[in-house]
Amino acid sequence: MNKRLAIPTLAAAALFLPACTQILLAAAPPVIHDPASVPAGTYAIEPSHTQVVFSVNHFGFTTYFGNFSDVSGNLSVVPNNPSAMSVSVSVPVSSVSTTSTKLTDDLKAADWLDAAHYPAMIFRSTSVTPTGKTTADIAGTLTLHGVTKPLVLHATFNGAGVNILDQKQTVGFQLTGTVKRSEFGVAKFVPLVSDEVQLIISAAFEK
């Protein structure tokens, strides 16, 4: 590119982009912060903006983090009756990722999560108990490594509204919980690597 042309072009772009951002912000619908005002219906997980993060205590030295992606699932919203709401989340075990390529491969193998034989980790709610205006305890079952056990996830409503980019109605939640991995037959290196696994699910649901 001709340098004489490049400089004015870049300068114009620098002026134009903030203007576009301001237009998008001005057009953005307000975010709903009251769960009772969220439109009713069934929402599907938007996988590109949903993450499942896990952490364990590693040898007593560090808290080690990893994550799963390509999550799917559904949320049934009943604004005036939160107890009637339900949620399901399915996590592909093979999507596990860590900062170590070797550890990531190990976690998929038979002596850890065994992704070949147990391809999905699935949570299905059985009841929802509100604990505050924007919080609730979601009781359900977790199926992992061929074992199904009860699990309670603590949910926090982040907000809802129309996503300005895809124009879909969107609801955001954060879910947290603790899984004792030995109860699911994944006991390798316990207690050097903690039995308790902390889960954080940051989920976007759309319809």
Question: What is each model feature region?
Answer:
Residues 20-207:
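Low-complexity, acidic/polar, glycine-enriched regions of mature
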Residues 1-20:
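Sec-dependent bacterial lipoprotein signal peptides
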